[in-house]
From Swiss-Prot:
Name by which UniProt lists this protein: Exonuclease V, mitochondrial
Keyword annotations from UniProtKB, A to Z: 4Fe-4S, DNA-binding, Exonuclease, Hydrolase, Iron, Iron-sulfur, Magnesium, Metal-binding, Mitochondrion, Nuclease, Transit peptide
Primary location class: mitochondrion
Keyword Cell cycle carried by entry: no
Localization annotation: Mitochondrion
Residues annotated as transit peptide in the record: 1-21
Recorded GO CC terms: mitochondrion; nucleus
Pfam families attached to this UniProt entry: Exo5
Length: 628
């Protein structure tokens, strides 16, 4: 009689038996995963007696449990013998006697064998033997803890068919082990930074920040009379501050640059994918539903242009003409009032047939583009995701505002927490042309002209005065800023007397993530009627930034939605995983040595090799059933 027949025969009866045994003997203790070794661990040789011991441990039969077993009078000895027979059959199918546990060649294999509780002599099964969907597992067992703290996906994670779906599948259940960075990846990152700096030159505020920190530490000793609950945070380098900087620079500044200069790089985008109906959320009430998964991405390049005449710059002549005539200047830089600029810019854009195009940049270590059709298709769909996200974020400023608020709150951030003084002054220095007029409004407690923010902004005293003094002239009652302004102006020559002096007071409304969400949502909405359907992928040589090729695509919503549905079914565990048919790709895969597809196994061999994993699935189901 075959082993598989034994398995089928005992499948239902033994699950019931295991539940009874767990209830009376094991006290619902969890199933302990087999301790699989990696190449860094010693190979274990298991004798016939050790085989029994290992299997007992695997089923959580400790010495104490066996003693307790003997002390249970209500369990008949014959019944125990039957139970032992069941376990003996299971053990014989899962782990043979005199077995040597092989070393697994990398951490990804070690992770998936431990998570799936597999015998390391077996190949990897082609299906998931656990109760967790890929998304559930990704959100609970992930080497990057930020995905556990804030469950979410990225655009690239949705492109599961790019190389091999089976590899993507195994990567999830390995615990999303990070692969080591390669030289090509490092060079690619440098190229992206270089391209970004060409459009958005970095303003180095290191010296100013060091001066402010040093000055703040000197003044702290003098501020002994300020109650702790009234003290404004001066220095905070936490996650809220980092998100604030990202929103200010990778949303507000980039979108403003897109309006003023026709192009922008590295813009943050996001959407909420409803895994139940396999589509992206389009109304704010649906954002908070548990089935709506946050999906984030960064689009490499967006250009605003006349698609029929790319050299046409009349739109930007009009916008610059308006800005130069409407706003005062400091150091020949207009101080833009966003409350006035946003509606005017939107009106100007509507008068022109200019459209946004969306580009992703792929870096290559050789002067050739990918030959695999699936890789090219995935790159195309990546640009479709970015185009779709921008469309959703530009449709309705209220939707985008609440979408950003939800984004921050899912990360555990308080959107009404005042930003630190250091973050505020840094944003002011780098982007005073955008933020100065708004900061004046916040300081005076004036509305910014966006009702969702104006109606909900909290009035919290924000001390933007005490820290901007020198220690030799410090006073809480009568602050004197003359020496301080001389010192900070000497660092980089900016007219701080013009952009800082009007703000040196206790603000009535502090700068917060909520404020940044409001302005970002309005800037997205400026482009509401200018979303184009052209996307492209640039392939660049990472050593020289040479453009090797550019693939241009027309956005197709039906085609895109089919891709979204397929990705949703993958992450929901609603369809079978499709392995690659190109086995030459397997040589680049960390799971190759244990993959049945990579090994070219026949259908009969694959069926035979899945018996062991089916037993593991059975054991996991019994464990879940006993806990329920």
């Amino acid at each position: 009689m075959s082993r598989f027949w034994h398995f089928k025969k005992f499948y239902f009866t033994s699950c019931y038996s295991m539940q009874r045994m767990r209830g009376k003997i094991f006290k619902n203790e969890p199933l302990v995963p087999m301790n699989v070794t990696s190449e860094h661990e010693q190979v274990q040789s298991i004798s016939k007696e050790e085989s029994r011991s290992l299997s007992s441990n695997d089923l959580n039969l400790s010495a104490d449990s066996e003693l307790q077993l003997e002390s249970e009078p209500e369990i008949e000895s014959e019944q125990l013998k039957n139970h032992e027979d069941v376990y003996e059959i299971i053990r014989s199918m899962v782990l043979a006697a005199d077995t040597t546990l092989p070393r697994l060649s990398n951490n990804s294999l070690t992770g998936i064998y431990n998570h799936w509780k597999l015998n390391p002599n077996d190949d990897l099964p082609l299906y998931n033997p656990t109760k967790y969907t890929p998304y559930e597992f990704h959100s609970q067992y992930n080497q990057d803890r930020s995905y556990i703290i804030t469950p979410r996906l990225s655009v690239t994670k949705l492109l599961v068919s790019s190389w091999c779906e089976l590899r993507s599948f195994y990567q999830v259940y390995s615990g999303s082990v990070r692969l080591p960075s390669t030289k090509a990846m490092t060079q690619g990152t440098k190229l992206h930074s270089k391209l970004e700096a060409e459009v958005h030159p970095e303003i180095d505020t290191t010296e100013i920040e060091q001066f402010l920190i040093s000055n703040a530490m000197s003044l702290r000793e003098l501020q002994t009379t300020v109650p702790a609950e009234e003290e404004t945070v001066v220095i905070d380098l936490g996650e809220v501050e980092q998100l604030a900087v990202d929103w200010a620079e990778m949303l507000i500044e980039r979108l403003f640059s897109l309006i003023m200069g026709a192009e922008a790089r590295e813009i943050l985008l996001h959407g909420y994918l409803n895994l139940k109906n396999r589509s992206f959320v389009t109304n704010k009430d649906e954002i908070r539903e548990s089935s709506s998964v946050l999906v984030s991405g960064i689009v490499d390049y967006i250009k605003l242009q006349n698609v029929t005449n790319p050299s046409d710059g009349t739109l930007f002549d009009d916008i610059h003409g308006f800005v130069d005539s409407a706003f005062d200047q400091v150091d020949n830089v207009p101080l833009v009032d966003l409350s006035q600029f946003l509606p005017e810019a939107k009106q100007i854009l509507q008068n022109y047939d200019f459209r946004l195009t969306f580009t992703d940049v792929k870096t290559r270590s050789a002067r050739q583009i990918p030959r695999q059709e699936s890789v090219l298709e995935a790159a195309k769909f990546q640009t479709f995701y970015y185009r779709h996200f921008f469309h959703l974020l530009s449709r309705d400023s209220r939707f985008t505002y609440f979408s950003l608020i939800e984004n921050a709150e899912r990360r555990g951030h308080d959107v009404d927490k005042p930003l630190s003084i250091l973050t505020t002054i840094s944003l002011l220095r780098k982007h005073y042309h955008i933020f100065f007029k708004d900061f004046v409004k916040l300081a005076n407690g004036e509305p910014i002209g966006f009702s969702p923010f104006d109606d909900s902004a909290k009035s919290i005293p924000y001390d933007f005065v005490s820290m901007f003094q020198s220690s030799d002239e410090f006073s809480l009652a009568n602050p004197n800023h003359n020496h301080f302004l001389e010192q900070i102006s000497a660092i980089d020559g900016i007219e701080y007397d013009s952009i800082l002096s009007p703000l040196l007071k206790v603000w009535k409304t502090p700068p917060t993530l909520r404020y940044l969400a409001a302005r970002a949502s309005q800037l997205f909405n400026v482009f509401n009627e200018n979303i184009g359907d052209i996307t492209s992928v640039e392939y660049r040589y990472n050593k020289t930034s040479e453009l090797l090729s550019e693939k241009v695509y027309d956005y197709n919503f039906s085609e895109f939605q089919a891709e979204v549905e397929s990705a949703s079914k993958f992450w929901n565990g609603e369809r079978e995983v499709i392995p690659t048919e190109d086995l030459s790709r397997c040589s680049y895969c960390e799971f190759q040595s244990k993959c049945m597809v990579a090994g070219g196994k026949t259908t009969e061999a694959v069926e035979k090799k899945t018996i062991g994993p089916k037993i593991r699935q059975f054991l996991n189901e019994c464990e879940s059933s006993s806990k329920g």
